[in-house]
Amino acid sequence: SQAGDDIVVAGDGDNIIIAGSGVDEVTTGNDDDIIFGDNAKLTFNTQGQPTELLSTELDFGDVDTIIAGDGNNMIAGGRASDAITTGSGVDLVAGDNILITLTQGTASQTIPTLMTPVDDIGGNDVINLGAGGAFVIAGAGDDEVTNAAGDSVIIGDQGTIHFAANGLYANAFTGDVDIVGNDTLTGGSDSDVI
């Protein structure tokens, strides 16, 4: 519950960053990163691959800035009003707190099966997506999501995304209609579901 204001700069490679509850700035290079702006618990299989990413200590969190490079990133801003920017790649992005589950894919990779919020508190997030496609649950608050390119699924408030066995989304639906905000959602140059 107590944390400082961190500046984290990570280079290329598959990075795992849990910034904690302070006002944090996180910048990563290319490759596949897992980034939580606030607190989280991560579960791995015996091969060292992630199987569950879960936001924790939900009452604590602050304003974070997250800039991720190219690659297939999984990012959660956390409780407060966060700014998230991604590069090229197929990204999973949550403006607030989130649960992401994954299953065994190839020998070196797991693929997502579920993405859903874990509480009803969130800030006014600004999410800028690069090319490549993304799956976004902006969450509570007045959020702004802008997609550059790539076939993306964007939910402005609460919702859940289920994925098929190949990692492509199978269905997406909105959540609690009482948890809403005045969101601005802008699609890119390809086919988006908003």
Listing of model-derived features with the role each one plays in the protein:
Residues 18, 36, 76-79, 94, ...:
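Short, structured motif recognition centered on aromatic/hydrophobic residues
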Residues 9, 22, 71, 76, ...:
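Outer-membrane beta-barrel transmembrane strands
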Residues 1-16, 29-70, 87-131, 135, ...:
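Acidic/polar low-complexity surface segments
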